[in-house]
Amino acid sequence: MKLEMICTGEEVLAGQIVDTNAAWFASTMMEHGVEIQRRVTVGDRLEDLIAVFQERSLHADIILVNGGLGPTSDDMSALAMAKAKGEPLVENVEWRERLEEWFTRNNREMPLSNLKQAMLPASAVMVDNPVGTACGFRVKLNRAWLFFTPGVPFELKHMVTEQFVPFIRDEFNLDSKVALKKLLTIGQGESALADKLEPLELPEGITIGYRSSMPHIEIKIFARGEKAIAVLPRVAGHIKMVLGTAVVAEDKATLAEEIHYKLLNSGLTLSVAESCTGGMITSQLVDFSGSSSYLQHGLVTYSNESKVRVLGVNPSTLDDHGAVSIATVEEMAKGARQILDSDYALATSGIAGPDGGTDEKPVGTVAIALATRGGVYSQMIKLPRRSRDLVRSLSAAVAYDMLRRELLAEAVIVDYQSIGRFSK
């Protein structure tokens, strides 16, 4: 089966928005053992849409078309598909009734423009959209099925998961015996990870892939077939052993997610004091429902004055050692923990750049501390200075990993291949 994707919209083509839908779809299909062969982005011009539908339908077996199903004049996917096939648009009565029902239920008058969303190519098969007003549909053109979905990410994800994946499994008799194990890593580059894993002799049906999403690199271990699935846990365990401290989570998208589920319902509490990370640690945890059960407070103490007045950092500590120092960050963590008597507190202070570095403390220098009821762990690390965002996100990841290792009763301070450390 040859799978392709067509993304529509001038704002996507012009780079005004990042096409996260395409990235999500490709990743999701890989998890089902299906690789996208080609992705095309086209603007909101009728003749361009018609041409790309006609041309790609000669080569693909299934094409997911994303976007252009709204009620406005620049939403032209349905019209373009009808013209590409040489047939009229006709009203789908079922979807019109669904639209009227939706607006009535929400106590709103339906604009006439929304009726456009019930107009589908004559040969189209309606595809339900349970969470929006844009009607999905599929049409056979040349050798391909074209499967139309709205550009709203939430709606796309529902339709792909609930309708697209089951359709292609039935239509193309895909083998459902596919399993995937994900290992999340920090502190090593993709090439360094590959150098360690490429020499491994993998069982038949097992393959390894890499996905860089800084500050993490995700290792995907695919198993295709019953025999490969049976040995997947053993293979994953061996890969973890080979990579050592680089592996920080299994089957989680981020370290924040790993920390969230370790603290959720644990009865333990966490406070955070952030300088260079600017609320990133706290924000990433708040993304998850239920974080209020363990997260007591997150403070952004960016100035020296706030470190002193809010966290109780001794002014002489700042004078003697500076804001970016082991001494200061330890006092920040202790102060954050003591405010509400939390079980744990994380603190960060660093130089994210691009300015502010010195010979002694260059850009990328970050001090991180973890305060516990039994004491304080701290380190000052040297991070790659490629960008301000990378310094901040890597700082948050190392802080999370310190807490993760403490929760597992492991050594809190460990070496990462691509992250240096200052001696205390």
From Swiss-Prot:
It comes from the Bacteria. InterPro entries: CinA (IPR050101), CinA-like_C (IPR036653), CinA_C (IPR008136), Competence-induced_CinA (IPR008135), MoaB/Mog-like_dom_sf (IPR036425), MoaB/Mog_dom (IPR001453). Coiled coil: none annotated. Belongs to the CinA family. This is CinA-like protein. It comes from Shewanella baltica (strain OS195).
